[in-house]
Amino acid sequence: MYEGKFTVEDMMCVLVSTIEEAKAVMAKNQVAMMVDPNGEMISKIEHIALVDAILAKKNLGTTIDMAPITIGLGPGFCAGKDVHVVVETMRGHNLGRLIYQGHALPNTGVPGNIKGYSKERVIHSPCAGVCHNVKKITDIVEKGEIIAYIDKTPVYASMSGLLRGLIQDGYNVTSGFKMADIDPRVDEYQNCFTISDKARCIGGGVLEAILHGLS
């Protein structure tokens, strides 16, 4: 966590450290976020649903009995066994679809296609080390331009376009770590500040799953 609070599309999320702080934040119709890597708070708060949105492509320990409604995003979960519902995260016809038996589509490792560009859009760290950014999100970059350094090793733009994603400056990355992505749609500057079509679709699927579970 790098910020104490952040706002996306008029919805503010606030970092909290206690249940009391979380309740106070939610009373203001804001989102409370708590750092809890071991999930210790799950058994300490009253909740109707648990959503595993880690997107690790595998189940890191979520079980179906953790909440009245348990939801897993993407591959790694078996609906009806690990969780009650799986939400499809693969771009395409089934994105956001609810799965009540079985699994989501397996991870292909291939980024979604935008204007004919797929693998070229994503930049991975050429080595392990500390990231030192030269460019920032929203910058227009040209193919071959240096966007960052890993220690002293330069990282080059894989294509020309809008720098839509970039790992935090000072982050310690491993070799091959996904650290940036470029959008060929240079005129869609606002995409850097708004919820993506994919995230909105998956979020809608989560909401549908919760409402269906409560009905």
Identify the meaning behind each predicted range.
Residues M1-S215:
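Well-ordered secondary-structure scaffolds
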